[in-house]
Amino acid sequence: ISKQIQHLTGITNQRVQKAPYFEDVAQTIYNLLADTIFVAHNIYFDYNFLNHELMRCGLPSLKIPGIDTVELAQIFLPTEPSFRLADLSESLGFIHENPHQADSDAEVTGQLLLLIEERMRKLPIITLEQIARLSSHTGMDTSRFIYHVLEEMKENPEPLDLSLEIIDGLALQKKEVELFTSVHYGERTYPRKKQAKEKMFGKTLMYRKEQNRLMNAVYDHFTKDESKDLMIEAATGMGKTIGYLLPLSYLATPEKPAVISTVSLVLQQQIMEKDIPLLNQLLDQPIQPVIIKSYRHYIDLQRFKGTLVEPPGQKQYALYQMAVLVWLTQTKTGDLDELHLTNLNHAFFADVAHRGTGFLARNQSFYKQDFVRFLQKKIKQSNFLIVNHAFLVQETQRKEPLLPASPYLLIDEVHHLPEIAEKVNDKRLSINYFHKQIQQLEEPNQLFDRIQSYLPKEHEALRWLSIYREELSALCEAQICVAEGLMNLVSSKQPNGQYPEEVMMTKEMLDQLPLESGTAMDHLQLFYQEIQQLQSQMRLTFEIIQESWTNQMRIDLASLYSLFDQLDKQYLLMDQWLEDWRDHLIHWFVPGNTAQQMIFHLHDFQAAMLPSTVWYPRYDRILYIGGTLKIGPNRHYLSKRLGIEAAPLKVIASPYDYEKQARIYVPKEAPAVHQVSNQAYIDYLETSLTGLIEQEDRPILVLFTSHDVLQKVYQKMHLSMLEKGREILAQGFGGSREKLLKRFILSEKSVLFGADSFWEGVDLPGDALQIVVVTRLPFDNPLRPMVKARNAYLESEGINPFYQESVPKAALKLRQALGRLIRTETDRGVLLILDRRLVTAKYGARIIHALPKKVPIKELAMEEIYQDIHEFLKKNEEGS
């Protein structure tokens, strides 16, 4: 038995020394299986493996039926975050002492099957009937099991649960908007003093001096301050969220709601499910919150029902359909994120995602139950609206605002806002995606044909539609011509004729294009202008005609108008891309292998300047809060990036004793990265990380600045570490970022290798993570085209890109890495930085100055570091 399997199962070579050979017991096993139903978690592996071994021993192939509990769990436990047997056991409260050991796995699989059957029997019969019809796509005999349970339920039907209703064949949770009723008449008094807060908190919350300062600062800003903007730096883990929610609860009403923006969907959920319920235990006027997300996060019931009428016949699609049928009996929000899926790019979600209320018709079966309409009603009865930064920033791009004006906007985790604002405002045009979309609309019985069929006697409208289709075809050809000209220009400048991954365009390069390419650009702009005129004319014509149309016809018209809006944006993008050469706009493209695969991008380095956004003037007061806002003595780095340099900054003293709670280590033998070969550097990382992982039996997060280096170190280490019982999870291997984080959080001693986004927003409880390794100081690669372009822009603004941008950004990332470790006054954490530039380079002193004061930075040999880390973390476990 290999070491890897020994660690996985706990079964050693010693234990099996006297065990019989499979050949000796094969006949017994075969006889035991006769007339049984084979149940397994991922039956395809177990059944086929066992069958192969039995046949090897000369026995006939198994013919017994089989049931797969993985597929059953995916269908009947749709909101579980993971379907691995160990994770399900933990989530459902099963005792699973020996994961991957046959007897323990079998017992837990049996418990899981019984629980799933119990859940199935609680479903409405109509739901199970629909699942049964789709279940032919499940493996082995799982479908027979579903039909068996259904038949038994039909023999003794139970009345429909009172919380459910049947609408047009779908069983749904009943929903009611909770009306906001003010418990108090007149003013409530905010508890400013320590004594008043202690009385209010009782035994539910502990009074904290720093949190009290934060609460009063928040209340004062929204009631007294003259300045519109205020920044507050408050350490993570000091009760920051409760610290701003409580004072706002004394001010916010549904007419003047508090809008709270945080960095991610996960943190939105955390505020909703953890922080507000805790605070509501203390308040005599409870907060009534609602999470607001873009429409596409919600399911459109009418569209989902449509997928059941004509199922596409693909297995994963059917599994999603069945899971959603179960989920609809549970959800009151229709928020697809409740399904914890990491692949929302599947065709199923494109088919069922909501597109907005403009696509609904009043006489549709599900109009009254529509989740987005329900959300809009809830917003009117809520005094706290919880959004994320991307949603907030997108307000600038919306025709109609989705957020109300208010006196109160609070932006949490504000240090993420500049990057998110720039990313959201990065305009792009994928020629391939657009052409496929137009081809689909041109297919028989698709949108254009359907619209045409609605106009049998409307000759003018038919003529406009015919011309419009011709113009779209000409536009697609013009796009290809322009793309070909740009690609020829770029390849002519490359020594090998190859295309780089990203190409930054300048006006000078555009002027070098040959005459025919210049003509193609003129044609492209002309087609866009003509399409604009046609769309305006068609809107006027259709507004008159559509009054006599049916609801389905109007929904198709809404789809056509959606295409119009898309082309309006496309025109603005390409017009800017070809004509607008202001310094802060970066024109670039991704070539692809052919002209049709080209993607145009327009990036705006001033997108994070808040005063120029649509939403900034709609709020009387804005408060910006985060754990790391100032960088050493530089108090205006972030406010400058946001265009609000005059905003005052208040710093709430950190409650943590970094001298006792944290250590930063820099190995004396760490190589100077630029002075050794790439292979020598990778070997050094492998040696350093192996020593640490072998010694410390706890979760470790390793942060890289290069995907290439990450992959090479992972490939060198992961098998040898697995044999020693340590699993390395790595970005780019084994699933999405969300899936990797989920597995890392659920495991007790995994190692996670991450780059890019793993530096940001890895939200783990302090006690779940005590060691972070930084393989190299987190500077952006200066050779990357976008970094070069940003540096050139900063220089044009009179800013030193290295000292005023790169160094502060690197310092901010290191502070955030340290902030992941220390979240309570009892946490201990270690930051191991395998880059000596922190202590040898001139700018290293600036970075150190930006880190918390008194955090010890130790330069030691690697072996001494291992020993010191072990002793430091062990002290914490011993309670000293």
Model-derived regions: residue spans:
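Conserved RecA-like P-loop NTPase helicase motor core
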Residues: 667-679, 732-837
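Conserved pre-motif I regulatory segment
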Residues: 181-232
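Acidic two-metal-ion nuclease catalytic site recognized across multiple nuclease folds
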Residues: 115-193
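Signature of the SF2 helicase/ATPase Hel1-core->accessory helical subdomain module
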Residues: 269, 274, 357-384, 388-530, ...
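A contiguous, basic/glycine-rich beta-loop/short-helix subdomain that forms a polymer-engagement track
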Residues: 356-380, 393, 398-400, 534-670, ...
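Conserved non-catalytic scaffold segment of RNase H-like nuclease domains
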Residues: 1-65, 78-100
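Walker A/P-loop
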Residues: 224-246
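A substrate-engagement module of RecA-like helicase motors
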Residues: 194, 255-256, 262-382, 787
